[in-house]
Amino acid sequence: MSNKRIYELAKELNQPSKDVVEKAQQLGINVKNHMGTITTGDEKKLQQAFKKPQTNKKPAQQASQKPATNQPNEQKKQETKTKQQKNNRNYQDRGQGSGQVNQGKNQSTNQNRSNNGGGNNQNRQGATQSGNQNRQGSTQGGNQNRQGSNQGGNQNRNNNNNRGKFNNNNRNRFNKKGKKGKQQTSNKPAVPPRKFRELPEVLEYTEGMNVADIAKKIHREPAEIIKKLFMLGVMVNQNQALDKDTIELLATDYGMEPQEKIQVDIADIDKFFEPEELNPDTLVSRPPVVTIMGHVDHGKTTLLDTLRHSRVTSGEAGGITQHIGAYQIDIDGKPITFLDTPGHAAFTSMRARGASITDITILVVAADDGVMPQTVEAINHAKAAGVPIIVAVNKIDKPGANPQHVMQELSEYELIPEAWGGETIFVEISAKFGQNIDELLEMILLVAEVEDLKADPKQRAIGTVIEARLDKGKGPVTTLLVQQGTLNVGDPIVVGNTYGRVRVMVNDLGRREKSAGPATPVEITGLNDVPQAGDRFVVFEDEKTARAAGEERAKRALLEHRAITSRVTLDNLFESLKEGELKEVNVIIKADVQGSAEALAASLQKIDVEGVRVKIVHSAVGAINESDVTLAAASNAIIIGFNVRPTPQAKIQADNEEVDIRLHRIIYKAIEEIETAMKGMLDPEFEEKITGQMIVRETFKVSKVGTIAGAYVTEGYIRRDSGVRVIRDGIVIYEGQLASLKRFKDDVKEVKMGYECGAMIEKFNDIKVDDVIEGFIMEEIKTN
């Protein structure tokens, strides 16, 4: 015999498929729904199970709407009297439309059913018996006639039954009805009483917990705790914070020992950098981190370029490194990480930050220039950080190079060469031609071996931000130096006051990496904002904790900033009152990287001009946008863009609102311009200085553009931003500004003597061949 499906067996048993599935699962038969198949043996088990009396019945239907298929279930009810059972069957037949009802008794039966609350509200389990018993009672005489000879004893007995059934019917009257008006009894199990749970022996609490929090900890209802506190003389609600004394009083009354839980400040990431956090058993050797320092143009970037075999300098404006770069090179299987700090005085803070995360400092000194101001600053930073110094005497290939003079000058700063009995390593090199570079690398590895540098690669990564910027397509891009542990893609991370998850990790060669060990520089994306250069970063165990820590740090930083900017004391009260007469320059700084923005802001704030000071209204990374222009218009500020350009919309808005936007690629030019503007507030005196002359050799007329002069510079130089005079036959016929200055279709800032160029003059097109164009600038006469 083939297997049978559940719904087929349900039809045979006259049972719902759902009940058959439930019964099969109770018997251990593996079926899931009505389409499941069962064997012949399982079929017999189910048939046997459904032959037993059913204790749980379905909700009753109206007596007039009972289907014939439910008759077998009705016959299984417990019988009390044979006569009542016969009457039940007769009543069921009448409810099924059989028509076999005594016409003489119909009126009295309907009357009894109406008096007893109506058959429509009767429960299925008692509908047949109660209906027939009511018909046999003494309600209104109809049944008395039918039971004439038994009015005495049977009437009293049946009246008692009717009272019980009447009460049941009244209760059922208010039962909910189904879709077709059928009565439904609740099949939901009764709510079990709450299981009693013992009180804990110790109550761990934190100050500020409320009643609801304590109720969860001690497994009690909040109302019970509120009542107990009321009895102890403390009136609270369940959401009210409780102080330490109240919590301890409550715990003592319950017989528990109160124990205050020390809260860990998740926003404090500096604790992860403590030496005590390191496990001595898992420490291994790590690569050294080397910082290259020195005066501007002494060859730091050229040295690093030689080490990396790339042209870093060619991409730098003015030959000066604009932001910290981190690179790693491999020497005979031993990696070395290099940090290239800018050499200009404006980058003092960045250089100090570089020294704080480095292991070895290479001090680059030009053999022809000797010790310069930034050289001394670099020495002081390295000594303050306790970092060993290796002196690289550069440019020994140049005529006039005097390495001995450099050694003599540095000895005044306690950097005495080993050849003179000191401890400082000196290496004479030529970064341009790669002379003695191998010897310098050997010295670095030697010093690193002596320093015995260790790190734990197994812990969660910690480190420092080298640089950060806002990329148009990638969002915040951050260069990190891993100091301890291993940084992996996907790690939840907190960087300064920002947070996120490491989405993409790229090494210094532009290749994607999945992990980065100690002393490895990488560039990551995935942060919610641009951090500050020099911020520390920590990897957290989960993203939720990292987010909470980052948001808390950002909140604290904002509150601290507001407190600093709004704080007034008796010491500065007089100065604050005088600020009404104080002239100031409001400046908004936008730069390509955070380090440059910081350096420019620090330099501008150091400008000391009597009666005038610089106020940095806003400093950020990224292109100059409409929000910056709106802020500048509201605060009457000048926008300085460093290596960034304004968006087209921002440029249009700036023109409409007459906001001054100054764009620069060299940092000291920006400082110089602001300083000049500040001194202008003091009504300085200027004098004219002729920079050069050029002779017009050809003219080109371009429609909708104007006249372009093809000229040859005969004296000095002509700058794009200088003023010009057009001289014809010794007479000045026009004075104005250059509209453009080009060489070979490229815009240039200046053209020197002996070179040809193309020039356009603003609002002047009457240029003739052999005209002389004289360039001049207005120089300020320095005031003492």
Swiss-Prot record:
Region spans: G1: 294-301
GO molecular function, one term: GTP binding
Locations listed in the record: Cytoplasm
Segments of this protein annotated with the region G5: 430-432
Region (G3): 340-343
Composition bias, Low complexity: 106-172
Domain tr-type G: residue ranges: 285-454
Residues noted as binding GTP in the record, renumbered to the chain: 294-301, 340-344, 394-397
Chief subcellular location: cytoplasm
Family membership: Belongs to the TRAFAC class translation factor GTPase superfamily. Classic translation factor GTPase family. IF-2 subfamily.
NCBIfam families assigned: IF-2, small_GTP
Name by which UniProt lists this protein: Translation initiation factor IF-2
Species: Enterococcus faecium (Streptococcus faecium)
Name of the gene: infB
